[in-house]
A protein has these predicted regions:
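Residue-level hotspots within the lipid-embedded alpha helices of multi-pass solute transporters
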Residues: 25-29, 62, 102, 106, ...
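Short alpha-helical transmembrane segments in multi-pass integral membrane proteins
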Residues: 1-21, 75-142, 186-240, 296-362, ...
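N-terminal transmembrane alpha-helices
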Residues: 9-37, 41-42, 58-70, 99-106, ...
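Transmembrane helical elements of multi-pass membrane transporters/channels
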Residues: 16-35, 138, 172, 201-205, ...
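Small-residue hotspots at the loop-to-helix junctions and early N-terminal turns
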Residues: 44-55, 132, 136, 195, ...
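Helix-terminus/linker motif at the lipid-water interface of multi-pass membrane proteins
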Residues: 30-48, 117-126, 182-189, 247-276, ...
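Short runs within selected transmembrane alpha-helices of multi-pass transporters and secretion channels
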Residues: 68, 138-157, 165-173, 194-209, ...
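Small-residue-rich hydrophobic transmembrane alpha-helices
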Residues: 47-107, 146-165, 257, 261, ...
């Protein structure tokens, strides 16, 4: 067990898996920041509008991304089991699942654009709503392309080849930034420019990932696209609970975002900017969470539960080290970092406080709340993670947000306190699940 030659993943193999994932996570966040920072030159109304739409998009995108995660778990376990043929068959089935869900939500977003925005954010200023509508219409068209990319990227990660999705993400982000420069600074079409850049980059990502899948010798995607109910059932076993968890979680975030919107533009902008900046601290931990699917999934597929626990502990230590190394400098330089967004004095004051608070909480509990949960999913323990996440979200993130933010008058600060209460509950319950060994209860559900 302790000899490296007997381990499924050497130290070098873990580094080769993790570094591309960290870079890709950075690039994904950079794309969102590029939209926000470059759109900031058009005014706070555009920034707020994009932020509100992004909250909806995260909900819709999260549903078909959950299908991709389900496929990734199944593919990783088959890879660990040494069955490459089943890896290929699983690939076909989850492309069908991801593609179908992505098309469905594109249609929903296009048809009910105004209705959704009015229902959720009917009390925002008119210029914010106008920017949100424009951005939403255009970005919705990109959903199927993003679904294709997410599906292909998840497959490459599941078999341990994370460099592919990193390279595609790099090219796509360069296209996005160039598009922003031309359409926002040059043509000056504000929210539409940011949305069009995102659309073009996602189309390119989808085309590139399809071409690379065709050339891959690790993933043999079949030309037969008939539904295989047995394999699809395994994907849905992971994907549906994950999707329900993700969607209900995002609904909760939408409710809190809607609550924040009622606190005024300063609170809305501070929330958007803090979320954007704070996400950089979470990059390594999020990347490790993605790697958990590959590493723990392959260990479980190979029947190596002791190795699964060993790698889980090892990767959590790395996640915490990264959180601390990034969090401390972000606290020290919080004000100059926030200064790049050209915020008003009132918004700046709120944003700096929220950023420092977020950094401290991330260093304490974030990896246990999120990265660790992917280990449970990779082992097939998806129902427990779903129940914990949904219950904690409603009780803490939503319930306490209204009590602290609105009831006690703490505003957006109260909402962030409630959010971190959610993190603490998740961290405690997931850690206890692993400590008792119950997370391995469904380890034979997928490949045996």
């Amino acid at each position: 067990m302790t000899e490296e030659k007997k381990m499924l993943f050497s130290q070098d193999a873990l580094k080769k898996l993790l570094w591309p994932l960290i870079i890709e996570q950075f690039l994904a966040i950079a794309m969102g920041m590029a939209d926000t920072v470059m759109a900031a030159s058009c005014g706070e109304a555009v920034v707020s509008g994009i932020s509100l739409v992004d909250s909806i998009c995260v909900l819709l995108i999260g549903l078909f991304t959950a299908m991709a995660s389900g496929g990734a778990v199944v593919a990783a376990q088959y890879m660990g089991h040494g069955d490459k043929e089943m890896v290929g068959r699983a690939s076909n089935q989850f492309f069908l699942a991801v593609g179908g869900v992505a098309l469905l939500f594109m249609m929903i977003a296009l048809i009910w654009n105004r209705g959704l925005l009015a229902l959720l954010y009917g009390n925002v200023e008119a210029d914010v709503m106008n920017a949100a509508r424009i951005y939403f219409y255009i970005v919705a068209v990109s959903f199927p392309f993003l679904g294709i990319y997410n599906g292909g990227a998840a497959l490459f990660r599941a078999v341990g080849d994370s460099k592919v999705s990193m390279k595609v993400s790099l090219v796509a982000n360069l296209v996005n930034i160039a598009g922003n420069a031309i359409l926002i600074y040059g043509v000056r079409i504000g929210a539409a420019g940011a949305a069009l850049s995102t659309l073009f980059s996602r189309i390119l990502s989808a085309v590139m990932i399809i071409v690379l899948l065709g050339k891959s010798d690790k993933i043999i995607v079949s030309n037969h696209w008939r539904i295989d109910t047995k394999i699809l059932g395994k994907i849905l076993y992971i994907g549906v609970p994950n999707g329900l968890e993700n969607s209900i979680f995002q609904i909760g975030k939408l409710l809190t975002t809607s609550l924040i919107a009622g606190f005024g533009m300063a609170a809305t902008t501070a929330n958007a900017v803090t979320g954007s900046i704070a996400s950089f601290q979470q990059i390594p931990a999020n990347a490790i969470g993605v790697a958990m699917i590959t590493v723990i999934g392959q260990c479980i597929g190979a029947g190596e539960t002791e190795q699964a626990l060993y790698y889980l502990k090892k990767m959590m230590k790395v996640a915490y080290a990264c959180m601390i190394l990034l969090g401390i400098p972000m606290i020290i330089f919080a004000r100059p970092i926030c200064g790049i967004y050209h915020l008003s004095p009132e918004t700046m004051k709120i944003t700096v406080f929220l950023l420092c608070y977020s950094c401290v909480c991330c260093m304490l509990v974030h990896p246990l709340s999120f990265a660790q949960s992917n280990a449970l999913r990779a082992a097939g323990d998806v129902r427990f993670t779903m129940i914990v996440a949904i219950a904690s979200m409603w009780l803490c993130r939503v319930g306490m947000a209204y009590i602290l933010g609105q009831g006690l008058g703490l505003g957006v600060i109260g909402v962030w306190i409630a959010m971190t209460m959610d993190w603490v509950v998740r961290a405690f319950l997931f850690t206890n699940r692993i400590r008792t060994g119950k997370w391995l209860k469904y380890k034979d559900r997928l490949v045996k």
